[in-house]
Amino acid sequence: MTLTERLREKISQAFYNHGLLCASYPIPIILFTGLCILACCYPLLKLPLPGTGPVEFTTPVKDYSPPPSASDHKPGEPSEQPEWYVGAPVAYIQQIFVKSSVSPWHKNLLAVDVFRSPLSRAFQLVEEIRNHVLRDSSGTRSLEEVCLQVTDLLPGLRKLRNILPEHGCLLLSPGNFWQNDRERFHADPDIIGTIHQHEPKTLQTSATLKDLLFGVPGKHSGVSLYTRKRLVSYTITLVFQHYHAKFLGSLRARLMLLHPSPNCSLRAESLVHVHFKEEIGIAELIPLVTTYIILFAYIYFSTRKIDMVKSKWGLALAAVVTVLSSLLMSVGLCTLFGLTPTLNGGEIFPYLVVVIGLENVLVLTKSVVSTPVDLEVKLRIAQGLSSESWSIMKNMATELGIILIGYFTLVPAIQEFCLFAVVGLVSDFFLQMPFFTTVLSIDIRRMELADLNKRLPPEACLPPAKPVGRSARFERQLAVRPATPHTITLQPSSFRNLRLPKRLRVIYFLARTRLAQRLIMAGTVVWIGILAYTDPAGLRTYLAAQVTEQSPLGEGALAPMPVPSGVLPASHPDPAFSIFPPEAPKLLENQTLPGEPPEPGGQAEGVHDSPAPEVTWGPEDEELWRKLSFRHWPTLFSYYNITLAKRYISLLPVIPVTLRLNPREALEGRHPQDSRSAWSPPQPAQGGLWDAGPKGPGVAQAHRDVTLYKVAALGLATGILLVLLLCLYRVLCPRNYGQPGAGPGRRRRGELPCDDYGYAPPETEIVPLVLRGHLMDIECLASDGMLLVSCCLAGHVCVWDAQTGDCLTRIPHPGRQRRDSGVGSVLEAQENWERLSDGGKASPEEPGDSPPLRHRPRGTPLPSLFGDQPDLTCLIDTNFSAHPRLPELDHPEPRHRSGCRRTQDCTGYDFSRLVQRAYQEEGMVPMHTPAPRPPSPGPTPPQTPEDEGSFPPEKGSPSFTWAPSADGSIWSLELQGNLIVVGRSSGRLEVWDAIEGMLRCSSEEVASGITALVFLDKRIVAARLNGSLDFFSLETHTALSPLQFRGAPGRGSSPTSPVYSSSDTVVCHLTHTVPCAHQKPITALKAAAGRLVTGSQDHTLRVFRLEDSCCLFTLQGHSGAITTVYIDQTMVLASGGQDGAICLWDVLTGSRVSHMFAHRGDVTSLTCTTSCVISSGLDDLISIWDRSTGIKLYSIQQDLGCGASLGVISDNLLVTGGQGCVSFWDLNYGDLLQTVYLGKDSEAQPARQILVLDNAAIVCNFGSELSLVYVPSVLEKLD
């Protein structure tokens, strides 16, 4: 077994066990899943509901004044300003955005030096802001006069009293962690620990203390030991109560003068007013509710054709809850992990619903309801999950692999998408497995307990069928016989779920193939590939930076190549006209930036191993507050008991501040314990590795030509579309669509309704292998795959080789009275029979060319065996040349294997006069028996000893006398290995050797005859005419040799039974007896899976345990005698009776699963496949039923007398008999595949019985002859 097969087996077993667990304990699992959903959705309480997010309004800074308290526009006139923009805001927010870095970076610096010195400059900035005073003609104005004065914090925030300001201006900075004391900061050995000590230990999704003081999201601050960018960002937040334009302008000018930002291009032109809502409105809910209603309708109409579901609405609701809960869990977990998804985004919902939601739900439902309906609910759930386990896990692994590859592209946009997709996949998989599977098991259990016991007959529910061409005929009409041997009667399309409408076929095709998942996965791969290669912060830039850093020259060792003036314009606005990208000029080691003083450290201290990170400003820095949590500002004001509900705040333009620190400052600000740290500084990333936003004018923008990638993406999309069209063509178009001469007008064989596309079934004629050897009609047939045993009404048993058709042994009817008993009389009977037969070995030529009769040597016979016979040695004539030659036949016969010749087949020398004279001389009178009755075409009841005859007197043959048997005729017959078990009308059970023809053992005679037998392993069960059961066991006193096994198991069969040696002693013991199993004779007996099922004329069935004959259940559901029973290894039990009804039973619980009114008259034959129930009756009608729903799919009208001739070759192939022919049908669609005529001479003989062997052969009973037909090769390929 390969690794893939072992892995597949493990996954299947795990899903099987999970299905058993979910179906066994549904309520606890649903409660546990609900608690998990609530726990994962807890962070959503901190997120806004759809439609309740903050609303923004932008106004220019120039000439700004707070709006009046009352709106002055008329109600009917449109206004550019929103309704909430009335009066002064709660506060004005001014953020001073600081970007700081240590430049140049030395090799001996530590990772903690990246952020310790930049953070220490926050104290200086705060001091400069607090000391700023505006002096103008109106006087002086300080910060205390214009800022928002706050009082005490809320009583529950005692831990934050030393951090957040109280009784003064609301000013926030990272220095608040150390109470704005620089000495505390320098004395702190663990800065990161101090920053994170107030982080909540529980689930918390609102603004944290770190975000409030830093003013930027945590991942953008750069305060980490693992940061690649040696750039620290934070803000100093000022909250003003009044807007004072002059004070704000002077503060901005002073800070930009003290800390200039040469390459900054931030615009200070507009104010952003943010309004916070309080309650959700009905209008905002309409789009979301509409989306889920459409989803609910889609699932309902996709599952409404699934008949084995109790509540279609409930299933659709469970699917919607699954998808919705998956969406909510994904958003909640992503919010918990630091991502900030929004429920308003249109890109989240389609991915979760289409890719990981609906397809698995639909596939799981179809897989579970397609399991055998007679199984227990938990077994059906387990089998359904196990069958789809490999495809679910394979798709899951593929999607996770794509997401993992996308995450390592190092593109921030792709990484954020991949993180959200991983959480969505895992949450959806978690919900589908425990929750939806458990809900499905509850629904199927309700269906089993409620609906199936109350289901009306399907005929009572069928709508009247519309006539299509000719009237549909459900039953056989004796007055009008069809012109063709078969008439197909189909049910209406609403009840025939095998041929689905094209719309549903497309839906199930898309769900079964996971086409949507595959298309979106392919699109995701293409998108990730293009974005990863073309994005300036992607993998290509990272690899280029790594190669440059590992180069011995380094990037800083090379000066840019000068370009002669006049060749190309030096500063063309279009980068496509420049050979070199418009990068900022690289500095040599002895150069400094303009406006920056030279470093005092000299040449020795300026040596560094990597260039310093360049501080850049982009448009995204103007509105960095948008990346904060939407509850950032409400949380801050709520600490001081200020609510922002139905109010707004105004955000002023950001003041940029750039700080460049030299390595000496970093070394001076280092704590003594920092030198003991083992952390090494990470390698810097070039070009802004983690920054995917657009850059300013001074940022390097590489020329990107994406034409090649567009062409590749277009070609890939075209290929995917072509494959999709080909798949849809195979689904929608018929098999011979577009072929000439195949139109609907050219139909043969009587316009068969099953021929939907004008397909004409082929007709062939083959010469069968005819098995002849019985003088009367064959009543019993049995086979174990290698041997075939037949018994006729005369009591003669023939053993045939199922491969070659040779007659191996003939067991005679022991009807001749013997004076001796015991083994001698048996041997004598065998000896006399062999004198009459030819040993079963004949060539397939004409009968006249057959070899002389042969005799199986038995050794020297005992003298006492022939005491009652005359001495005929004097009659032996060795002069063969004088004998007349037999006339040759004019026409050849079909090839045959015969056990004896009929008198009309050949003529020979008449020995009657010689034998008669020898009898007279010995004083013996031969006895004659009456001629046998002509065979009856119908079922023949068991014959009594007085009714039975023997061989007719043949012309030219010795008149051996066969008296009526005292042992009774054969009523039942079974075969296993090389043992034949025979049940006689006298009540005697006999075990014969099929190869040697010897009687191995027998039981004592009982007054009641044996009507049915079961021979399974070493157990024999005999059902008697008085309703009793006898359980026998076979024992052998010689161990079996490992080589004593015949052949290999055939297709779909169990291993071949052992062959008992002739030296073994076989003993049959009676182990149990059930004296009153039924009140009337037992008419049907079957055994499988350790269970024995009996059917009787008392209208009941009983289920016994085979090992101890314990009666488990008595099944009552028929209103007539039981005529046929079916049971297999999967414990599928079906029964048919004289009332024409078919019942399906659950063997494990003894309950009736389904009840179907099948035929007008007795049900003569019954068999099942994995999805269908096939029945035949005396009305010569074969009906095929859906096993899960009990609805008739279609029926096949048989020839007169051929109603019981059917056999199942496989789950998809059915064979039926007709007048001298057999027909093969496709069980899935009811199509006639092929009709095989068995020669022209047998056309008038109906096939009364069909037995399917394991070697792809079929045995047809044509009265006293058997025909061995091999399945056509085209059908074997189809199977």
Swiss-Prot record:
PTM text: Ubiquitinated at Lys-454 and Lys-466. RNF145 triggers ubiquitination of SCAP, likely inhibiting SCAP-SREBP complex transport to the Golgi apparatus and the subsequent processing/maturation of SREBF2/SREBP2.
Highest taxon in the source lineage: Eukaryota
Record's bilayer topology term: Multi-pass membrane protein
Protein's name in the database: Sterol regulatory element-binding protein cleavage-activating protein
Basic and acidic residues bias: start-end ranges: 885-896
Encoding gene per record: SCAP
WD repeat copies, ranges: 770-810, 952-1002, 1005-1042, 1077-1114, 1117-1155, 1158-1195, 1197-1235
Compositional bias annotation for Pro residues: 929-944
Entry's Gene Ontology cellular component terms: endoplasmic reticulum membrane; ER to Golgi transport vesicle membrane; Golgi membrane; SREBP-SCAP complex
